[in-house]
């Protein structure tokens, strides 16, 4: 996640787990599949946090700054018909997150903007505060008033779908076969369950189901004595040519080129 200018990932998300597994000989798959959340708060002072998609479901509308200014000057009303999203989807701001994230990114590049706006001022403010108290509180910390001020948002790298290829027990795979003693659980793993986009509320599946399967497999192998020869069967750490590695330029400077 830290390869990207805008990400919801913590600062420790630098790909070390995938790199270590790769050097141990594990298969790495689908690294090009990254889910971007369409509406993270854009701010130069704080780490991006998610503006829930439920806010768009409640009636919030995506607009460029120019569209928002013209809409205000015209007297307000429902801003949906003025949104750039209609150029990308007949569903406007209510389309799926992959469509919306791609549309926002395309529009930002087209006009040279760092963000677009999520407009809520046409909605009932009291109802918004009741339905989205946490969002309102976080926005208030940034001096943004929900139901009054437009919210600056930008797509943010949210979830790495690819990673260390694993089997149904979370065992890392090497040349299509499970490796002894190496398991990958959570976002570092590529389970193959998601396709090219993350399934919603995947923590239960990735963190709980797979960790449960992995732990039961490890306990079973220990009880049967299969772990006794583990050390001698581990592959050598692949470290050739490390002295010749050159630090890659991250995506952040590339975006400024």
Predicted regions and their residues:
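Short hydrophobic core segments
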Residues: 1, 21, 182-184
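An anion/pyrophosphate-binding glycine-rich loop and adjacent beta-alpha core
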Residues: 20, 26-152, 208, 217-220
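Acidic, glycine-rich active-site loops and adjacent beta-strand->loop/helix elements
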Residues: 1, 33-42, 46, 188-190, ...
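Thiamine diphosphate
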Residues: 9-22, 28
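Short, glycine/acidic-rich beta->alpha junctions
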Residues: 9-14, 43, 199-200, 206
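Short loop/turn microsegments at loop-to-beta-strand junctions
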Residues: 57-58, 160-162
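Glycine- and aromatic-enriched mobile tails/lids
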Residues: 63-94, 104-107, 159, 165-184, ...
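Flavin (primarily FAD) binding-site architecture
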Residues: 1-8
């Amino acid at each position: 996640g830290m390869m990207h200018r805008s990400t919801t990932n913590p600062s420790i998300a630098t790909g070390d787990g995938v790199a270590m597994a790769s050097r141990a000989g594990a298969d790495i798959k689908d690294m090009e599949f990254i889910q971007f959340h369409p509406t993270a708060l854009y701010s130069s002072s704080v780490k991006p946090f998610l503006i829930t998609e439920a806010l768009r479901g409640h009636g919030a509308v995506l607009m460029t700054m120019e569209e928002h200014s013209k809409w205000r000057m015209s007297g307000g009303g429902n801003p949906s018909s003025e949104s750039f999203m209609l150029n990308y989807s007949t569903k406007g701001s209510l389309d799926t997150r992959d469509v919306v994230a791609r549309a926002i990114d395309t529009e930002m590049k087209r006009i040279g903007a760092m963000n677009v706006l999520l407009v809520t001022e046409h909605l009932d403010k009291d109802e918004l505060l009741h339905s989205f108290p946490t969002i309102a509180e976080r926005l208030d910390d940034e001096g943004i008033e929900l139901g009054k001020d437009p919210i600056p948002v930008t797509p943010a790298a949210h979830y790495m779908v690819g990673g260390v290829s694993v089997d149904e027990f979370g065992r890392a795979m090497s040349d299509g076969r499970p490796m002894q003693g190496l398991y990958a659980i959570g976002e570092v793993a590529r389970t193959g369950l998601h396709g090219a986009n993350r399934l919603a509320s995947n923590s239960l599946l990735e963190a709980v189901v797979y960790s449960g399967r992995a732990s039961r497999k490890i306990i079973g192998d220990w009880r049967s004595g299969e772990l006794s020869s583990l050390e001698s069967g581990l592959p050598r750490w692949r470290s050739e040519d490390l002295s010749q590695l050159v630090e890659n330029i991250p995506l952040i400077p590339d975006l400024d080129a």
